[in-house]
């Protein structure tokens, strides 16, 4: 619509909630796909093709204008059309330019009138990252407290309801009888303890027995009689009786000692007794109120791609355990000092006091790094930011069993600094982020190991080497590329590494046919297509066997023949990543999403897709894989959408649907019905080894 009369009445507030990237999701269903922000209030909800929460808000509040956060379209519900015009002050144009600046993190926005509209949550000048992180941490505490309060109320209501049922009454009667039995046992133990204390006090306060008095008198008599003997015999008797005289105080029994000589039992008797508990004397261990791993990650502004990948990596047992043990604080400090020496920062020697010990203090050289930061420029250097350190910090919080929600602000800040392609609040691809993240983590570990081999402690060097080995091998596999010449039947083999398998859909799904979109596709069919034999177009292959008799100085041309090519798996990784290429080209430059459902099973046998010509065939158990995680893309296109993940929780033995801050337990049948984008399968042999290491 060229002219909408409702836009002229628009009065946009300076501090609208749409300027906060953390609000770019539906407040009802938490999706980031097709999110519309009301221009009359701070409400943000999903469009009519998702759950119609924005339309429902219009029906309740009668606010006609809404703006799509990602595409920046303005829609009027009263006119039932898109709006093309603007108001007199140009608020819509200014709002679009401000949102574009927030997404790209470029805040140089100017207007003809000089008016600016800034985002208080995304502008680095008004709100530093540390202050924003503190605000998010307070919100996380409040969310966790509300979660605990809600769970306690639900548990109390359930217990009240259960107490009214027949089964509940029976259980309460059994618990009451058990408590009475425990109370009787406790009273009996208390009576025995009291009787024992009384006997001890009576024995301590009673005079020594007659037998002991007679024995002491006899000992004194024997020690006095030798004094009347001659001098020679007296010396000999004294030598024999001296040990007896020294050892006489030592054989005293507790009955002979006075209360002044036994302060410990008296103090122990005066020690106040703890109040008895209803369940007995054994202390009850307090369980974590949140299951480890069931911790949501706050959406900081179209960061669902990062949250889904972090949830998957944290639920991979081998990957998680490595970063839980890894601590690169000391290594990073040494790395920073090495970098500063390379840059020629000689001013550091002048700033540091002469008597300062670099290794003194509990921080182990924190003063050195603090002084080094004083002479560095204000812009943070990417060499001092570590994704490994952020993973080591984030994973323990997610698996502590204490937090229901965590804001990964530090992780996002590190990603912005180290991977500039993901800087800003624009929507990104989860597969690309996973590849870039693993590549940066691998390079960090390699740089840490090579630059500081002698200064890092031996145990840390071994741990860094182990983690690097796990990161390099957990997703690493090998492909066998085999080309067969059709003229001489000679086969040329090439080994190529891979970290994931990008599987294409069959040809029938690359058309706009509605019948093909309704028929589901199987994962085994896509794997068979990946490993099928394909014919090279025309005579384009220069066979080595056909041209081996030709010399380099020969003037004859190289013989080109027809050939066939096939890809097969030569070495399987511990964790198999299957990337489903859900796009097709429509026209020259337009990509569409293939929204067909892919049928995948909980167990996967990779033996049909591995090469069988190699002499060292692995054990049949190595071909079996178990489903560990699924990343899903919700939406019709690649320019917009929402990412969630299904992850298998090894601690609880159940599946969890991770939708940013909202996590819910689900069944495996629901997982298999998901529209998968990335599949993670863990080798069953590797799972058994991880379980044995835990035991």
Swiss-Prot record:
Disulphide bond pairs: none
Gene3D superfamilies referenced in this protein's UniProt entry, alphabetically: Cysteine proteinases, Zinc/RING finger domain, C3HC4 (zinc finger)
Binding residues annotated for Zn(2+) 2, in chain numbering: 26, 29, 46, 53
Binding site for Zn(2+) 1: 4, 6, 76, 79
Active-site annotation: 304 (nucleophile), 642 (proton acceptor)
Keywords, sorted A to Z: Cell cycle, Cell division, Hydrolase, Metal-binding, Mitosis, Nucleus, Protease, Thiol protease, Ubl conjugation pathway, Zinc, Zinc-finger
Record field: catalytic activity: Thiol-dependent hydrolysis of ester, thioester, amide, peptide and isopeptide bonds formed by the C-terminal Gly of ubiquitin (a 76-residue protein attached to proteins as an intracellular targeting signal)
Any single Gene Ontology cellular-component annotation: cytoplasm
GO biological process per UniProt: cell division; central nervous system morphogenesis; cranial skeletal system development; negative regulation of ubiquitin protein ligase activity; protein deubiquitination; proteolysis
Extent of Basic residues compositional bias: 209-218
Molecular function GO labels: cysteine-type deubiquitinase activity; zinc ion binding
Protein's job: Deubiquitinase that plays a key role in the spindle assembly checkpoint by preventing premature anaphase onset. Acts by specifically mediating deubiquitination of cdc20, a negative regulator of the anaphase promoting complex/cyclosome (APC/C).
Family: Belongs to the peptidase C19 family. USP44 subfamily.
Name used for this protein in its record: Ubiquitin carboxyl-terminal hydrolase 44
Organism of provenance: Danio rerio
